[in-house]
Amino acid sequence: MSITSPPVEVSVLTDSIKNLLEKNFLRVVVKGELSNVSLQTSGHLYFAIKDSKAVLNGAFFHFRSKYFDRRPKDGDYVILHGKLTVYAPRGQYQIVAYALTFSGEGNLLQQFEERKQRLAAEGYFDPKRKRQIPSEARTIGVITSPTGAVIQDILRVLSRRCHQFQVILYPVTVQGPTAAQEISRAIQVFNQENIKIDTLIVARGGGSIEDLWAFNEEILVKAIAASSIPIISAVGHETDFTLCDFAADVRAPTPSAAAEIVCKSSEQYHQELQNLLRHLSSHSRQFIAAKKNLLSHWKKHLATADFYHTAQQTLDYTRLSLERTLDAKLEHYKQHLAQYKRWLKSDILIRVEKHLSNLNQALESAIKNKLYSNKVSLHQLYTSRFKNELPNLQHRTQHAKHLLNQLSRRLHFVMANSQETKLQRFARLQEEFSFMIQHLLTKAKERCQSVQEQMASLNPKNVLKRGFAQLFDFNKHSVIISAESLKQSDLVRVCLQDGEAVLSVKEVWLNNDKKG
């Protein structure tokens, strides 16, 4: 790309670099020291591998499902097999590993393979020299540690499966620089003519390749091959293989399985072996066919694998960032919460809260009593005073009108029989009296109108028109004025402006607290 080339976007340039890297570094093997090791809950491993001059970031997807027995840590020296790629969101190149061996294990595995090939070429693993385990094994020699769980497992199985047997234990160390020589010496002792042994079990529990290395030593392999007594090798777990397994007459996946083999008759053992071979043959064909199909499937989708890994790595980084942010937020809120708790525990605040609670209860009680008293008084006023006063005012008005008529007639009579001055005086008196009567009538009308308005405002039916309702006890027919008199499932008669209804109480709250 020359200087005169048109500009490209960062993502396009990054993709070009990624394609070049993946094309030219499809398979790489790199060794170094691990740092910043992080095994995510998704099972993916993120790390950096370094030496004294450079650092290379890396990822191992689905690491946990492939290497469940050992977890790498900072400072481990490892050998990685993988490919180079680019993590586009950060614009950094990295190695995506698909195999990992610890540096020490790598050397041991190489020694294992070289020694295995050489001893096989010398005939130590030849199937023709292997012997069958006697069908009636009565005396069994066991070469193992006397203090481990291995000897206990063997004895437990023999006690359960065999009726007559004798176990002769030759105690040895099963790990360390002298272990191979001790085990070889034990085999030679058992092969002496004066000791009658039907079969030998060489056993040890599981461990790392370093722990089991004594069983890969040449001196022990040759001692097993030279034994005239059939030997069962029961070293490690089912997934562990040592050179002793190849040299022994029978390999047992576990020490307990070795005891099971001893207890079986030759015919039963042969039949089970044939069944196992048929099962393995069938299962192998199915397994190979399935793996071929899976390989074909992944070849078709190989182009999308990098996108998936990139997306998965982005999700893991995002989750880590969110976890750090969440932890910081939680710590911040915890500090505030602790401060609030210290404030709330203050004696002054407790006393104030108690005093406020007492005042609140007293105020609520006084308000309830006052409201109830006012309601009763208003009801009594409505039923007695206003009902009686309205007819009285009407009667007084009629009486005033009657007096006015009488005075009017008397004035006319006096005016007709009096002198001019008396007529003037009566005219003035009539005018004053008329004004007084009119004033009284106006006051009486205003008072009457005020009373009628108060009666209308206190009339329960008018109150109902404004959206309110009256509650009556369904059984006692009394007015309900407090929520304390109600409980769940009570029946209540409700009066509205245009009718009535019967309701059932489901829940009751007092001062924002749920009653039932």
From Swiss-Prot:
Return the CDD domains for the record.
ExoVII_LU_OBF
Principal place where this protein is found? Answer: cytoplasm
Under Enzyme Commission nomenclature, its number is 3.1.11.6
Q: Could you mention a single GO BP entry for this protein?
A: DNA catabolic process
Query: Where on the tree of life does the source sit, at the highest rank?
Result: Bacteria
Where, subcellularly, is it found? Cytoplasm
Q: Name one Pfam family in it.
A: tRNA_anti_2
Q: Which InterPro entries match?
A: Exonuc_VII_L, Exonuc_VII_lsu_C, OB-fold_nuc-bd_dom
From the record, what ranges are coiled-coil?
none
Q: GO terms for CC?
A: cytoplasm; exodeoxyribonuclease VII complex
Presence of the UniProt keyword Lipid metabolism in the record: no
**Catalytic activity as recorded in UniProt:** Exonucleolytic cleavage in either 5'- to 3'- or 3'- to 5'-direction to yield nucleoside 5'-phosphates
| GO MF assignments | exodeoxyribonuclease VII activity; nucleic acid binding
Q: Could you tell me the keywords of this UniProt record? A: Cytoplasm, Exonuclease, Hydrolase, Nuclease
Question: Briefly, what is this protein's role?
Answer: Bidirectionally degrades single-stranded DNA into large acid-insoluble oligonucleotides, which are then degraded further into small acid-soluble oligonucleotides.
The annotated subunit structure for this chain is: Heterooligomer composed of large and small subunits.
Q: Which family does it belong to?
A: Belongs to the XseA family.
Q: Under which name does UniProt file this protein?
A: Exodeoxyribonuclease 7 large subunit
Which species expresses this protein natively? Answer: Chlamydia muridarum (strain MoPn / Nigg)
